[in-house]
Amino acid sequence: CIERSVLIPFSDDITFFYGNTGVGKTTLFNLINYVLGQELIRTQTIYEEVKGVCIDAFVCGQRLQIERKISSNMITVKDERDVFSFLAKGDSTSRVTFSDYLYKLAGLKPIEMLRGKSSKAVRVSFANFMWFAYLRQDELDNTLFYLGEQNGNFKKYASNYVMRVFLNESKEIEKEIVQEINKI
């Protein structure tokens, strides 16, 4: 068991992790996803050796320390002046979320999409975009966006929202147009 912090430097632009099977690439990505608000995939190594995850990053020119302890539902963010806490999972309508904070740093309003055939707006979280930051080679086909998922799989809907953001569609588009698109 490692009784110290492990520092893994990332590039300022983009970082690629490559290597043989079983060296920890997926585990590293899962830890990054966890600190950003997703569920942790608990392997024996994670269970035995990881107490928390902390990312030091520059986001929109501001240095942030983003931290989440194992078995915690709270994300703690420290900037140059303040400390903020966000629920990793929960009702995103009741308070400011971590995604809202990131959007604010970028000078954006939280992104919302109309859900399916209803006129209810749904927020697109930062985590929805993270699914496309790690691409498994065996998933680089028509299942990439989970559009074939049955029974209303949440990834199908969230992937649809992310694609619509890429295509510059948001709730500002008239509801009638979106409803017509959903009929197709």
Residue ranges and their predicted role:
Residues 1-66:
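Extreme N-terminal "head/tail" segments of very large remodeling/mechanoenzyme assemblies
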Residues 67-71:
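Short beta-strand micro-motifs enriched in acidic
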Residues 72-175:
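Extended, charged alpha-helical "arm/stalk" segments used for dimerization and assembly
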